[in-house]
Amino acid sequence: MKQDTLEGKTKTKNGIKRLCFSIICILLEVIFIITIVTRLNEYAEIINLFTRILSGILVLRLYASDKTSSMKMPWVILILIFPIMGVGLYLLIGLNGGTHKMRERYAEIDSKLLPMLPDNQECLSRIKEKIPKAGNIASYIQRNSWYPIYQNTDIKYFDEAVKGLEAQLEELAKAQKFIFMEYHAIEDAEAWHKIQDVLEERVKAGVEVRVFYDDMGSIGFINTDFVKKMESIGIHCRVFNPFVPGLNLFLNNRDHRKITVIDGKVGFTGGYNLANEYFNYTHPYGQWKDTGIRLEGDAVQSLTVTFLEMWNAVSEKATNDTDFSKYIIHYDYKAQQTGFVQPYADSPMDNEQVGEEVYISMINKAENYCWFMTPYLIITDEMTHALCLAAKRGVDVRIITPGIPDKKFIYNITRSFYHGLVKHGVRVYEWTPGFCHAKMSIVDDCMATCGTINLDYRSLYHHFENGCFMADCQAVVEIKNDLIRTMGECRDVTDQYCTGRSAYLRLGQLFMRLFAGLL
């Protein structure tokens, strides 16, 4: 045990070293670009002309893009005021969505996978008839992301991540055919070791096991030999978008999804990653609040497709699936529940912000109340307007954010949004026991979401995300009850941020808000 602990500490230290190395490499790339241009003094006029032309082209490109003004303005200001630095940063992290070749690869895989999902028009008609406002949102998701609405699915909500982990371990042990796991962060520590022990047993029983994680999300948690270690015990493992020094147009796009699929029958998703802090095994930021859901039935097909998309698109050199049908299976399952559920995914590979549009649609459809829980609150003008307009219509709009931050700078930006919201009637609560990482929304006792999508630019525009839209089911009731309990542990900071702020504080917050879209 002591040896394992020492080994774990060594791996964590190596991961932190690699994180520091990655940050240093990015800074060196920016410095290199600036230095090259600056030192060519004898060509100052040519360089100046070239920089101005390039800056102008980039500004025009930004202006003509489909991005919101909140996304465009910071880059335009940065490029115009500091052309060399602005152009360098934009080339490194501002080009959202990867290369044309990469987008083609994702589109090709989607063209094979997504049509394998059922159309479920009868189910869509039923939800439109029973709950018209939820039906409209379900229709939007299906028309713009291919993911259909389902019934014949039992839904279990977990108000604590550790409950989700326990349920996952139980279901993983029952696997007979395959296990798919996709997570933003995996920590080679206690929580993962529990999962790994079960996975090893299932591999020995002939079960196919695949594990997929984001390189930057896990960089401080595991060492580079993790993939080799998994492969040595029979677990197929791939890494999303590994950091490599050099110009990477895909660097800012991370896989933030959290999915487990067992035999195509049972699926899990939610806000938690597979690291100790999510289950309160460690407490770096006080108590950790996270949530998740378990699906059993027809809707698991969508989670399977979401996993297979990323697994097969991550590398054109890897050996990929040629027959998806053996994983997308329709079982003769009879659910006890009759509610509606719609797992969906969002991608920076297209110009459709499904995650944000679902949230805004729910806000616009709200008649009585609309509540959110999010770890970060860094939102566009469009979402700000929707929240404020709902509050001005008399809708009870509430947002729960952490009382203890994981990133103080980001927390200050989150708080900079409070005043603009509360002055129009939105109520803001901070969860005093610690850090709430859950990403949930609920409207009028009839529909809710639970998944990976934060109320911030990175989730809404840059990351690969997934969520679960639910309506007319017990999970919606349980989410509401959980939010009420959570608000009982919060401090209501609405009145505190209604009052005016000092000029110094306003200036600082305006500066941070200006560049919020770059984060």
Predicted regions located by residue number:
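Short glycine/threonine-rich loop-to-helix capping motif typified by GTGT followed
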Residues: 385, 411-415
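N-terminal localization/anchoring segments of enzymes in phospholipid and broader phosphate metabolism
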Residues: 1-357, 361, 365, 405, ...
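Helical hairpin unit composed of two closely spaced alpha helices linked by a short loop
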Residues: 376-397, 402, 407
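A C-terminal junction/extension of Radical SAM enzymes
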Residues: 421, 428-429
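Thr-Gly-centered strand-to-loop micro-motif
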Residues: 373-374, 401, 431, 450-451
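Catalytic-core elements of nucleic-acid end-processing and repair enzymes
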Residues: 439
